[in-house]
Amino acid sequence: MARIAGVDLPRDKRVEVGLTYIFGIGRKTSNNILAAAGINPDTRIKDLTEEEVNNLRRIIDADHHVEGDLRREIALNIKRLKEIRCYRGIRHIKGLPVRGQKTKTNARTRKGPKKTVGRKKKK
């Protein structure tokens, strides 16, 4: 099993798909990395030589923010928004959608389960 950026890549997957198991690398970035390394995207991870794995490791470490560094950067950005109390920061604090979605009917993922409000019965 190839280990790149602290992630064990699945041996039976194609390299193009296997690299997407690393946080911060999607299909497009994966293809760009493989083009820079000169590796065929259809190759299976188990068929990579040690030299090719080291080359991939070097390219990812040099050119891309991945895994822990990227998670830390995102968390710091959100923390900064909260500290300066801008609109987006306040939405993060309140647990509401940040990117302008409507909240009258949907947004259950951010708001959590519905809290039913009781009503007094008429006599």
Swiss-Prot record:
InterPro entries membership: Rbsml_uS13_C, Ribosomal_uS13, Ribosomal_uS13-like_H2TH, Ribosomal_uS13_bac-type, Ribosomal_uS13_CS
Residue stretches in coiled coil: none
Gene3D superfamilies: 1.10.8.50, 30s ribosomal protein s13, domain 2 (4.10.910.10)
A Pfam family that the UniProt record links to this protein: Ribosomal_S13
UniProt region (Disordered), positions on chain: 97-123
Any one of the GO BP annotations: translation
Biological role stated in the UniProt entry: Located at the top of the head of the 30S subunit, it contacts several helices of the 16S rRNA. In the 70S ribosome it contacts the 23S rRNA (bridge B1a) and protein L5 of the 50S subunit (bridge B1b), connecting the 2 subunits; these bridges are implicated in subunit movement. Contacts the tRNAs in the A and P-sites.
Composition bias type Basic residues, residue spans: 101-123
Gene name, Swiss-Prot/TrEMBL: rpsM
Full protein name: Small ribosomal subunit protein uS13
Record-level Gene Ontology MF annotations: rRNA binding; structural constituent of ribosome; tRNA binding
A cellular component annotation (GO) from this entry: cytosol
Similarity section: Belongs to the universal ribosomal protein uS13 family.
Assigned keywords, A-Z: Ribonucleoprotein, Ribosomal protein, RNA-binding, rRNA-binding, tRNA-binding
Assembly and binders: Part of the 30S ribosomal subunit. Forms a loose heterodimer with protein S19. Forms two bridges to the 50S subunit in the 70S ribosome.
